[in-house]
Design a protein with these regions (language model features):
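His/Asp/Glu-rich metal-coordinating catalytic cores
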Residues: 1-17, 22-214
Length: 214
């Protein structure tokens, strides 16, 4: 694991807010806490559950503060607002920071799936309102953001899976990122619909993500 140097004088980090629970956003948290154990970790329920599981691997029990999309928290000099976004992991948020110096909007990772399986849309109305109020710095994370158009909706894979489950003569082997709960949910639903047995060979993080989302 390679992480940036975070040991500047006195480790001046006052709190850490994670927009979602993917490894590239939470993987360095235990190393940060080893420098300064009292840093409060802020995030949604699912995100913090994954953060706590990550910290448990390092025998660290963090101090956490749970937020939901729409919440506004005062974190030091920053008024911090959390906005719902859709992503390939549940419970993702964007973060808006307001201070006397200006306003920063950080989207975190997001996609514009208009028919998400979990019903959680990227809240463009909320983002538009923030834009109308004035944003001094807009920081957006999204793979292939420079390509025009939309990401194919997650529901598009449903008919493909259904066709395979309906016509299977042997076993179906499915691999998935542990955190992609919606992607795991689809084959489980078709397995039940067609009364097929299932054998799950979970990796470490698949077990933790599944337990967290249950």
């Amino acid at each position: 694991l390679t992480i940036p140097a975070i040991c500047w004088p006195s480790c001046r980090v006052a709190s850490s807010a994670s927009p979602h629970g993917h490894e590239d956003h939470i993987g360095a948290v235990p190393y940060l806490l080893k420098l300064k154990p009292d840093i409060p970790l802020i995030g949604t329920t699912f995100t913090l559950a994954l953060v706590e599981a990550k910290c448990e691997e390092h025998k660290i029990k963090p101090f956490t503060h749970t937020i939901e999309a729409g919440d506004i928290e005062q974190l030091g000099p920053f008024e911090t607002e959390f906005i719902a976004v859709n992503h390939s992991i549940p419970d993702s948020v964007a973060v808006c920071l307001r201070s006397a110096a200006g306003t920063v909007l950080h989207t975190g990772d997001f996609k514009l799936d208009q028919t998400p399986l979990d019903g959680r849309l990227t809240d463009l109305r909320h983002i538009g309102r923030l834009g109308a109020e004035g944003v001094d710095l807009f920081m957006a994370d999204s793979t292939n953001a420079d390509r025009p158009g939309f990401t194919a909706p997650e529901r598009d894979i449903g008919p493909v899976l259904e066709r395979h489950f309906a016509n299977v003569a042997g076993k179906i082997v499915i691999a998935s990122f542990a955190s992609h709960v919606d992607r795991i949910q689809l084959p489980m639903a078709f397995r039940a619909a067609f009364s097929l047995p299932v054998e799950a060979r979970e990796g470490n993080w698949l077990m933790k993500a599944g337990a967290t989302s249950a």
